[in-house]
Amino acid sequence: MPIPIEIKKLFSAARILGSGDDRVTLSENELFCLLAQCCSDLSIQAAVSQLPSLSVLPPSADYYRLPLAWFQTAQADCPSASALVESLAACVAHEPDFSLYFSNLAALHKRRRKYQRILSTQPRPTMNQIGPRSLLEFGGVQHELLAAWLVWRKWIFDVDNRAAQETGYLFEPVLASCLGGEAVGSRNSPVKRLNEQGQPTDEGRQIDCYDGEEQLAYEFKLRVTIAASGQGRFGEELSFPVECRAAGLTPVLVVLDPTPSPRLTELIAKFTANGGRHYVGADAWAHMDSKAGRTMAVFLERYIRPPLTEMAIHEDTGPEPIQLSWSRDEILIRGSNESIRIPRRV
């Protein structure tokens, strides 16, 4: 039976990210491991997937516990690209949402691959770039310490900016797809900003997730606190449900952290006053699981919820002391119990 064109397009899209020097291309070996991971997550047997057994077993069933190097470890019976496409088609025929599950996991994996390369290649700041900043602190400490402080904070700032960029391409689009919608940029948004007279303008508003079937406009938030944003930014958040209602859409607020705050209460009231809905904490996760359906709820619970929930635990605790060192071959970050080694390829 011929493989549907949509399956071939799905496989091709899953394989490549970006272009030029920034391109990430997944090998057959990596795609084999990712397909096997999806099948394991969804309890799809080999009789269905037609995938051979992995000759090098994963050290954990949890994707986040698997080193990126494992995906590149040669598997003795790795199928060809055409055989992998056939397996993908078989899995999609068995479970239609497998296509989205695999696509999202591949997107996550490619971004993680790309970010590791960024960490390895992000240039060390030069004194030509950062030297003038020493005027603000010069003389207060030894020159060597000040120079190190300038270098580290600039490099960390740079790699954090790159992390924000990569996450922006990943988090909201993946979350939106799990809910059966899509993230919409301001240029193509059906929600328009209102002027002072309450009339729509030509300027659109970004929507975290647009559900065209039910005409819902989602706003995702990890947490809403008094310190989360300035008054100007909060005014933007309060105007979102008003502008959604004016566009004929139902605004939906999803806040993953249940920590109460006056601003959260005010934001919920604004959504409610404009015919909107809100889901906070456990209700937010339950709503998303219900909306996602059986298969994509597994993706949410395995790949989205664990890192967000775990990191939220450390919101109000002081950061653990760490030691940073930079050698020719690596950057070493030491904590109290573990270390992070970043090979350098500059």
Language-model features, listed with the residues they occupy:
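Interdomain/boundary linker segments immediately adjacent to catalytic/signaling cores
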Residues: 1-178, 327-346
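Short, surface-exposed loop/turn motifs that are enriched in glycine and acidic residues
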Residues: 165, 169, 208, 223-230
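Active-site beta-strand-loop-beta-strand hairpin of nuclease catalytic cores
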Residues: 205-218
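Flexible internal linker/loop segments at domain or repeat junctions
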Residues: 200-201, 219, 231
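Domain-level recognition of nuclease-like catalytic cores that cleave nucleotide substrates
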Residues: 256-346
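Short, well-structured alpha-helical interface segments that form or flank functional binding sites
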Residues: 166, 170, 174, 204, ...
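Catalytic cores of nucleic-acid endonucleases
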Residues: 222-273
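A short acidic/basic microdomain associated with nuclease active sites
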Residues: 176-202, 208
